[in-house]
Amino acid sequence: MSIDTGSTAGPDVDTAVDPRPPRPLHQRVARPALALGAGALTALSLPPWGFWPLAIIGVMLFEVCLRTAQTRWERVRIGALFGAGWMYLGMGWMVQLTPPGYVTAGLIFSSYHAVAAGVAPAGRWGVIGRPAAHTLVEAIRLSLPFGGVPLATMGVSQVGGPLAPLASVGGVILLTWVVFQIGFVLADAQPGVWAAIRQLRDSDRTVLPNFIGRIAVALVILLSFVAPSGAATGGTLSVAVVQGGGKQGTSAL
């Protein structure tokens, strides 16, 4: 008598597991927290605080978060958190006017930067594409809805800094792009200009996007020095400023 000792295969079971171990909690929290803090630093460059270098530092930290993000959805979340830190703190005075409007406006404007972070290129050309994308959504914010909402803008953050003369060349939009471009270039950690030129001579194109960003910013700044600044006409103009509404808890708007 023979006995079948072979095993009978049961139903197929998918035993595949993700080879990547789950990241520790502090690693999962660090990047979102840094993105939120980067937005807050950007807001602190605005009045009444008004320390203009914080805008560039905030953008640099924002780019550090974006460069280490592994998926598009993660970049979207980072963009939203950066925008939230920037807008909710920068427009904090609005809560005294209309709390629902404050929450809604911050949510809408944060979503602009979430979209920009999601659609901008993620490769080496991100150092050019990302500043352009975030400048574009700021241009949209200054135009839509209802003719635009020029609050907590990057241009206002630079009024007391050396980049302010750029406004005479391209207004707040150009100033916004320069701040974003400087921050993204500095966070890219590429070699100096002369080293980059040597690498380009050796057909190393990895430094090309960063090099283009540096040259573009330098050219715009040089242009601001030679751009016409106008001259006094000798005439006078009387201007009246009226602010309506009740007590708002702010010294000036």
Predicted regions and their residues:
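Membrane-embedded alpha-helical bundles of multi-pass enzymes
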Residues: 2-6, 10-230
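Soluble catalytic regions of membrane-associated enzymes that act on cell-envelope
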Residues: 227-253
